[in-house]
């Protein structure tokens, strides 16, 4: 057997395999004999069709089958011998039987060769969140809003109130536009931006007030649109008093007093923002290393990530896209993001290889012990059994390996902790 490897690009190779008749003939004869036994031709007993006739009938398909078998048999051995790292399935480009030889040309993609940058040259800032009593009170207020009651008020609307009114579109002369009325529209001032024209016009208004609102055009040269809002009602969310009885109701008896409830809210907030800090750091590190390693990405790898992103988007839309969406065009818009995913996979695999990272059964057990602390209803033994199952093992190995890769990165880069306040949010 002869073999010739040609580099087509940084991520593509072509392998030429040349086999002598002595090497491929046994396979050819076997395929021919199997065909002879199974093919039925009128006028001949099954298994007794003349070889010459059989070759004329199925010669091309027989040769294709033999070429496929020979390519499959020899490619993996050559890949091991030549240290080829395929990134896609090998495809037969061509084959030729002639002069006592079988020549097969196979194309495939490979992982590109590249050098990792010195990780110690990179610095990152990690947010260090500390939950204050004020943060806890804000979070509890959000929880109480879910148990509040909307009540009608006579006073002027404040920033957290809701106004209900009829909205009428006006023409340039201030007259109502035909079919331009929207009755009982709700304006929740809390969720309107501070510079929203409706919010600016309606704050401080009471039931019975009428106010005109001018909405400036989004595009230069456009005309402003005028509206009149006739306020019919102002509502305010009245929050219940936080006491032990409400705590029992909110937590379904998990906590029996306000003190314990507040302590748990603080604990949950701290856990959430500690996790957010870690995830933000990991994302910043991977984004930087993707940027610093502009390695070429195999097409098959990119296509795989494109399809993954497409399916994720489809799931978020309830399992199918709107009919108006051109799926092929949308798939193409996902390509830049897919290339980043592929590049990160190449970089992370390189880090794992250079640091000889692997996942052992002991690693899986340690991971199960850590997860069991988060979920007291499950024992370590139950989790180990699940993680070692055929269905979950590959996923768990991948998860643990990712952790090890990030641990290597964190051990080499410089990380500066920065005290950061908990961001305020509305609800």
Swiss-Prot record:
Residues 160-240 form the PPIase FKBP-type domain. Its main location: cytoplasm. Keywords: Cell cycle, Cell division, Chaperone, Cytoplasm, Isomerase, Rotamase. Transmembrane segments: none annotated. GO terms for biological process: 'de novo' cotranslational protein folding; cell division; chaperone-mediated protein folding; protein transport; protein unfolding. Its EC number is 5.2.1.8. Pfam families: Trigger_C, Trigger_N. One of its GO terms (molecular function) is peptidyl-prolyl cis-trans isomerase activity. It is found in: Cytoplasm. It catalyses: [protein]-peptidylproline (omega=180) = [protein]-peptidylproline (omega=0). GO terms for cellular component: cytoplasm. It is an enzyme of class 5 (isomerase). Involved in protein export. Acts as a chaperone by maintaining the newly synthesized protein in an open conformation. Functions as a peptidyl-prolyl cis-trans isomerase. Consists of 3 domains; the N-terminus binds the ribosome, the middle domain has PPIase activity, while the C-terminus has intrinsic chaperone activity on its own. Belongs to the FKBP-type PPIase family. Tig subfamily. This is Trigger factor. It comes from Chlorobaculum parvum (strain DSM 263 / NCIMB 8327) (Chlorobium vibrioforme subsp. thiosulfatophilum).
């Amino acid at each position: 057997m002869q073999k010739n490897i040609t580099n087509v690009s940084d991520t593509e190779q072509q392998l030429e395999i040349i086999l002598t008749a002595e090497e491929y003939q046994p396979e050819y004869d076997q395929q021919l004999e199997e065909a002879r036994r199974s093919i039925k031709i009128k006028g001949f007993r099954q298994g007794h069709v003349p070889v010459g006739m059989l070759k004329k009938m199925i010669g091309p398909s027989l040769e294709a089958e033999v070429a496929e078998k020979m390519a499959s048999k020899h490619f993996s051995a050559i890949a091991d011998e030549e240290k080829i790292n395929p990134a896609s399935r090998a495809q037969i480009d061509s084959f030729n039987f002639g002069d006592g030889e079988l020549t097969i040309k196979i194309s495939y993609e490979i992982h590109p060769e590249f050098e990792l940058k010195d990780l110690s040259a990179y610095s990152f800032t990690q947010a260090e969140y500390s939950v204050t009593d004020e943060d806890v009170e804000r979070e509890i207020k959000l929880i109480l809003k879910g148990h509040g009651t909307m009540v009608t008020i006579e006073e002027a609307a404040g920033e957290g109130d809701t106004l209900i009114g009829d909205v009428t579109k006006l023409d340039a002369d201030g007259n109502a536009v035909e079919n331009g009325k929207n009755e009982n529209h709700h304006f929740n001032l809390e969720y309107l931006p501070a510079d929203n024209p409706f919010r600016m016009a309606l704050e401080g208004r009471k039931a019975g007030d009428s106010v005109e609102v001018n909405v400036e055009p989004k595009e230069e040269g456009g005309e402003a649109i005028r509206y009149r809002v006739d306020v019919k009602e102002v509502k305010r969310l009245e929050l219940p008093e936080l006491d032990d009885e409400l705590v029992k109701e909110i937590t379904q008896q998990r906590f029996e007093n306000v003190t314990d409830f507040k302590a748990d809210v603080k604990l949950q907030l701290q856990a959430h923002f500690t996790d957010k800090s870690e995830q933000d750091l990991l994302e910043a590190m991977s984004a930087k290393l993707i940027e610093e390693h502009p390695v070429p990405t195999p097409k098959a790898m990119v296509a795989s990530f494109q399809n993954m992103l497409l399916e994720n988007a489809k799931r978020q839309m309830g399992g199918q896209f709107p009919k108006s969406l051109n799926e092929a065009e949308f798939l193409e818009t996902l390509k830049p993001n897919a290339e980043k995913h592929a590049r990160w996979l190449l970089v992370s695999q390189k880090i794992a290889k250079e640091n000889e990272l692997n996942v052992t059964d002991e690693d899986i057990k340690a991971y199960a012990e850590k997860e069991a602390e988060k979920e007291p209803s499950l024992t370590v033994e139950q989790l180990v059994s699940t993680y070692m199952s055929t269905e979950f093992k590959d996923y768990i190995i991948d998860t643990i390996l990712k952790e090890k890769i990030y641990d290597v990165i964190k051990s080499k880069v410089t990380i500066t902790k920065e005290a950061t306040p908990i961001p305020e949010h509305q609800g």
